[in-house]
A protein has these predicted regions:
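Electrostatic, structured charged patches in enzyme active sites and in nucleic-acid/phosphate-binding
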Residues: 1-219
Length: 219
């Protein structure tokens, strides 16, 4: 994809990439300043609901690393703490053969020196899942709008016991089986568990469909 690609690849807004976004991350509890639609796509697809991501930051970061005897200034946009370690992430439109070779060199040198990984994210990594961008953005907006919503300890304990016993199922059955509580509170708690990585949630069009599948993650 070229730099003139349209946002409909991710957002269907028919405008050129480069929009500036302020978004709230429920995972990190901070407002993110994202400088393009592809950063939004990367955040919502790969970070916000990724159970292996503990926390992350976006900024204009840089670090110096020695590669083949020469010092290089490496720039990157995201600093991501996975459960298995830290990774610096550079984000751009495309990744040609030269960029792929550079990515491998930086990753190897950075790992040897600091045990930190390096990854180059491009459109080819994002486009295959672009249809999930808007559904996940809507889910994130729902969680943000309800981030201060009180949920009773009884419901929380009940849901924890239910998912621990059932381990997987369809959202509709979960709502039926837990019918002593309000559907809106049950859905909010389920989505909070998805956002925090306790459960996985599989959906085709939108996570708000009662036919969506949930599954307790194995730690």
């Amino acid at each position: 994809m070229s730099g003139k690609s349209k946002t409909y690849n991710f957002t269907s807004r028919k405008k050129s990439f480069g929009n500036y976004w302020l978004v709230y991350s429920n995972k990190t509890g901070v407002i993110l300043k994202l400088v393009s639609d592809r950063e939004v796509a990367h955040w919502i697809l790969n970070l916000e609901f990724n159970p292996n991501v503990q926390t992350f930051k976006f900024d204009d970061f840089s670090t110096n690393i020695l590669i083949d005897g020469l010092m290089h200034d490496i720039k990157y946009r995201a600093l991501v703490q996975y459960s298995c370690g830290l990774e610096y992430q550079f984000i751009s439109v495309e990744k040609n053969d030269l960029a792929k070779s550079r990515e491998k060199s930086i990753d190897a040198a950075l790992w040897r020196a600091t045990h930190i990984k390096f990854r180059h994210i491009s459109d080819e990594d994002l486009v295959p899942r672009r249809h999930h961008v808007f559904p996940l953005l809507r889910l994130s907006a729902f969680l943000t709008a309800n981030k201060d919503q009180f949920i009773s300890p009884g419901l929380i304990d009940g849901v924890d016991a239910y998912i621990g016993k059932m381990r997987r199922g369809i959202v509709a059955k979960y709502l039926t089986d837990m019918g002593d509580f309000s559907k809106s509170a049950l859905m909010l708690q389920l989505y909070r568990l998805y956002n925090s990585g306790v459960i996985a949630l599989s959906f085709v069009e939108t996570p708000f469909m009662y036919g969506s599948l949930w599954e307790l993650r194995h730690e």
